[in-house]
Amino acid sequence: MATNDLFPPEPPLPDPAHVAQLRRALHEHAHHYYVEDAPTIPDAEYDRMFQELQAIEAQHPELITPDSPTQRVGGRALEQFASVRHAVPMLSIRTETDTEASGARNFDTRVRRELGLDEAAPAVAYVAEPKFDGLAMNLRYESGILVQAATRGDGEVGEDVTQNVRTIGQIPLRLPADAPSILEVRGEVYMRRDDFEKLNEQQRARGQKTFVNPRNAAAGAVRQLDPAIAAQRPLSFFAYGLGEVTPEQAGGPAFGTHYELLQALKTWGFPVSALVGLAQGATELVAYYESIARQRDALPFDIDGVVYKVNSLALQRRMGFVTREPRWAVAHKFPAQEQFTTVLDIDVQVGRTGKLTPVAKLAPVFVGGVTVTNATLHNEDEARRKDVRVGDTVIVRRAGDVIPEVVSVLLDKRQPGATEFTMPRQCPVCGSAAVREEGEVDYRCTGGLFCSAQRKQAILHFAQRRAVEVEGLGEKLVDQLVDGHVIRILPDLYRLGLTALASLDRMADKSAQNILQALEKSKQTTLPRFLFGLGIRHVGEATAKELARHFGSLDAVMDASLEQLLQVNDIGPIVAQSLRTFFDQPHNREVVEQLRACGVTWQEGPPAPVTPTPLSGKTFVITGTLPSMSRDEAKDLIEAAGGKVAGSVSKKTTFVVAGTEAGSKLTKAQELGVAVLDEAGLKELLDGHS
């Protein structure tokens, strides 16, 4: 026999770069999920990536690093709230990878193996409960009084959200006299589906942003910095476990099973789900799983699976923990719900900032408890990657039970002649050119002043304080003006009359007169403010000032060639092309001319001579409160002397101008060795260059 047959080569090590990339991706997605409450991928995909990393590290323990996502529980605490170190870590529960009912049998088999039970041994007793889709919470009571509520955070350190949690009616603020002197109750803060729908109706009525799902709404309420706002959000709570508790030898409770613990929670005044059940062995676990799956869509709250726990606390202690999770519990998720449907059309929608998004219009299909008729294709690259075409039969998944997506196309069912989707090169709303800039994935409409899809955003941007400044013209008033068809295009602002304004909801004559006076006042502006107010992509305040200084007049800016634009200080190819594209659209030029005809005016002068300014090439950052001038005034002085004002400190920063309560920007400047000036130092610098 050959040597190679006797000693087969070991399988190759995984690519370290792939392992590192997997960790980075998991960290990033965990941050979006736990900290920002804005998940970027479906739960199922995160679980798949996590399980891949777990498998690699199990095969190759030498690749485990202290910062691996497998070595900790979840996200990290937000900085806005005080940090709380948990007396007993809030560990997460392992997810069963088999999302069929057989996954319950897998868990029972694993438990029996861990406990060394043979086939003749009695069935293991379990507690089974729904896996609530909310926010994990730790409630700490001392001498029967709620003294602290904290989120899971990273399992070791969470966020102190006591004031907000006190507003939840289901959570007792005082416990009965027989409750332990130290008691930490763990459970889930969630929002009922009917409460979620009512909340979104209220948000729509106020013209405010609606919430994506009950979990995000609940998490957002708990993390509100203003408890008064949190109190207006209808939150609920289910208790399912304990943290730190007065020990038995010090007079604390003595439980033999997890189920007894849950019954005690009820007697102390905590809500425990009526769906919690006892199960003997694998067969009853499977029956419980199937029963909850059937009830899922009819439940008044969202769940995404069930949780099984060994009932005996003695057996729990015997089984113990592994790394980040208990061996005696598992989360058994439901399968991602998928259905077949047909693509009826592919529409391109235009967002309020001009972004074009392809959307598959679907034959109605019931997925994940809702009827789905649309699925985003995100952008041209994604649409091409999936190659979705009109008439295709596709698999649609309500991924993570939240976001409908087209998973794949059944190519064998594709009809002959189905044409490939291409993004339009004109805006489907206004007909202006749609442009995809180098390095970007999105197409954007260039008719920002004319496009009805961008109308509200264009008006708000034009009227803001840093542009022409129309005092009192806020989002709610703009909503009324646009939705009521009072304003079609930007110049219509200056055609408003008292009668039209006074007829709006909650608009008295005096308020209407104030708006008209503010509009009249805004007509006297400056060229930099006007240019900034046009909302040209990539043209901020500093760029607008450079354009005005360089060309002197609006007509010169509008007619400048790419080559001429590139001669302006701090303007590169992307900004130059953005300017040229904007002013090449006849719609945009027409709006500009109408604004001038309505009386919007400014002083113009000759182009600035090409001479170096005193602070040319120097970058400033202003932080804190200055004694005798506002930050805007300091910014104007610096820019008038040719300096540039940035929003963040970097190695390229020349000076940081620091007032009182300067904060992190001053700290970073000191770390980087950037020169720091106070107001007197800034004045001295400006005087020295005047």
From Swiss-Prot:
DNA ligase that catalyzes the formation of phosphodiester linkages between 5'-phosphoryl and 3'-hydroxyl groups in double-stranded DNA using NAD as a coenzyme and as the energy source for the reaction. It is essential for DNA replication and repair of damaged DNA. It catalyses: NAD(+) + (deoxyribonucleotide)n-3'-hydroxyl + 5'-phospho-(deoxyribonucleotide)m = (deoxyribonucleotide)n+m + AMP + beta-nicotinamide D-nucleotide. Its cofactor is Mg(2+); Mn(2+). Residues 610-690 form the BRCT domain. It comes from Albidiferax ferrireducens (strain ATCC BAA-621 / DSM 15236 / T118) (Rhodoferax ferrireducens). It comes from the Bacteria. GO terms for molecular function: DNA binding; DNA ligase (NAD+) activity; metal ion binding. The active site is at residue 131. Coiled coil: none annotated. NAD(+) binds at residues 43-47, 92-93, 129, 152, 188, 309, 333. SUPFAM superfamilies: BRCT domain, DNA ligase/mRNA capping enzyme, catalytic domain, Nucleic acid-binding proteins, RuvA domain 2-like. This is DNA ligase. Pfam families: BRCT, DNA_ligase_aden, DNA_ligase_OB, DNA_ligase_ZBD, HHH_2, Nlig-Ia. Gene3D superfamilies: 5' to 3' exonuclease, C-terminal subdomain, 6.20.10.30, BRCT domain, DNA ligase/mRNA capping enzyme, Helix hairpin bin, Nucleic acid-binding proteins. Keywords: DNA damage, DNA repair, DNA replication, Ligase, Magnesium, Manganese, Metal-binding, NAD, Zinc. HAMAP family: DNA_ligase_A. Belongs to the NAD-dependent DNA ligase family. LigA subfamily. GO terms for biological process: DNA repair; DNA replication. Its EC number is 6.5.1.2. Zn(2+) binds at residues 427, 430, 445, 451.
